[in-house]
Amino acid sequence: WIMGHMVNAIAQIDEFVNLGANSIETDVSFDSSANPEYTYHGVPCDCGRTCTKWEHFNEFLKGLRKATTPGDSKYHEKLVLVVFDLKTGSLYDNQASDAGKKLAKSLLQNYWNNGNNGGRAYIVLSIPNLAHYKLITGFKEALTSEGHPELMDKVGYDFSGNDDIGDVANAYKKAGVTGHVWQSDGITNCLLRGLDRVRKAVANRDSSSGYINKVHYWTVDKRQSTRDALDAGVDGIMTNYPDVIADVLNESAYKAKFRIASYDDNPWETFKN
């Protein structure tokens, strides 16, 4: 999965997919009542990027729905996965469940079109704080009470705080999560970070007792760091330059081992060689 980083304006969806992304990451900020409010990152952000592009969250969802609904004039067949980077740092810990419920209702109405031929992309809820695990249970409760528990089939999870792998496993246990797990690891492109924890995550993914289904690394903008991440065995790379990742995937060393995921590749299934 080539994951376009910080896609917060509707116009950027086309831009990143046209550069080669089959997945996008979008920031979600919350108001003081735990309603998802804007797709907005803010300052500071990655080096070389404008930090302040934004939409109202529900409007972004409508644009995203068009981009992922077959038959729509804005449809992109290859856009198959969306990561919502949930900026829950502005919330109290006890608001996490509410944030999940409100997020689910927004998605149900504006993205999934109340279960009637909505957008088809798989969704990853990426949460920065392990203490906010109730966002997951709240999200699930809301979809169930709204009569659409089947949409949970399209939803996966990530804790993005670079926490100890064992602590992450524990948070999922508390949230009752037993699958659909992406594990992110990384740092802003302004700084360097080694691949030690990525290797631990990959080892967990590939062990019979692991909880991780997919591992992605962020934010990778250079060819050599792309090669290093692929050599470590990641499933996804988040980038400001999808074309760079696509170029490396075309190199003879990687062409035989990797390909760009399509809609038929289940993002919740661990890839077995």
From Swiss-Prot:
Tissue-wise expression: Expressed by the venom gland.
Keyword match Glycoprotein: yes
Cystine residue pairs: C45-C51, C47-C190
Annotated catalytic residues: H5, H41 (nucleophile)
A single BP term in Gene Ontology: killing of cells of another organism
A GO CC annotation given for this chain: extracellular region
Entry superkingdom: Eukaryota
Glycosylation sites: N250
Coiled-coil boundaries: none
Cofactor binding, note field: Binds 1 Mg(2+) ion per subunit.
Top enzyme category: lyase
Keywords in alphabetical order: Cytolysis, Dermonecrotic toxin, Disulfide bond, Glycoprotein, Hemolysis, Lipid degradation, Lipid metabolism, Lyase, Magnesium, Metal-binding, Secreted, Toxin
UniProt subcellular location: Secreted
SUPFAM superfamilies: PLC-like phosphodiesterases (SSF51695)
Name under which the protein is recorded: Dermonecrotic toxin LapSicTox-alphaIB1aii
Phylogenetic classification of the source organism: Eukaryota, Metazoa, Ecdysozoa, Arthropoda, Chelicerata
